Amino acid sequence: SCAVGGNIIPMAYGLPESRFLGIDFSPGQIRAGQNAIDCLGLKNVNLMQADILSLRKNIGEFDYIIAHGVYSWTPEPVRERLMEICKENLAPDGISYISFNAYPGWHMQGTMRDMMMYHTRHIEKPRDRLEKAQDLIGFMAKSVNVNDKYGVFLNAYTNLLNVYNQFDIQRRRNKQEDEFGLLHDDLEEVNDAFYFHEVVE
């Protein structure tokens, strides 16, 4: 999903002879991205609001297909369709970039996700869930020896949360509260990790 086009719009600006197509399920994200395109006067990039399951081969042939933040956070039918699109729409010498949560590294963060999901299981409001999850991470970071391997991970994770938090505060100051969530990745209902061979095979 292209979200607001934060990746492809700068590329379209810097590569005026190339053409770009961004696709996202969220109408709000597409509108925000289109506003940026209009302000820049770009003619070589288009954004499309669509469900990936409804996309057909006639969207065109691409030298690059980038799917960041999709594979691990969507159900199996969407993942399968994404792979089909790469097969159908990628140029013969094209490259597809698909990000996903990868094992074995994800095992440690997956443990934290399980704890956060359990800790926030009775909380419905997204903002309250995020704050409760942050509290848990902070508590865990303080409870584990910083020299322990798990302690090193927790402290690094806490630092990452602080960066996310500052970014989120700035967005709210700018009244940009759309579907973006502070811990969107880790608290998403679907969040699956895979070994590399499971994706490429």
For each feature predicted by the language model, list its residue ranges.
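Conserved SAM-binding motif I beta-strand of class I
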Residues: 19-24
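A short glycine-rich, Lys/Arg-flanked "PGG" loop and its adjoining helix->strand segment in the class I
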Residues: 80-92
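Conserved class I S-adenosyl-L-methionine
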Residues: 95-152
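Conserved SAM/SAH-binding beta-strand->alpha-helix loop
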Residues: 26-28
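Conserved SAM-binding loop of SAM-dependent methyltransferases across substrates and taxa
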Residues: 4-17
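A short acidic, Gly/Pro-enriched loop at the edge of an enzyme's catalytic core
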Residues: 56-65
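Rossmann-like AdoMet/SAM-dependent catalytic core
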Residues: 148-201
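Conserved SAM-binding strand-loop segment of SAM-dependent methyltransferases
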Residues: 41-52
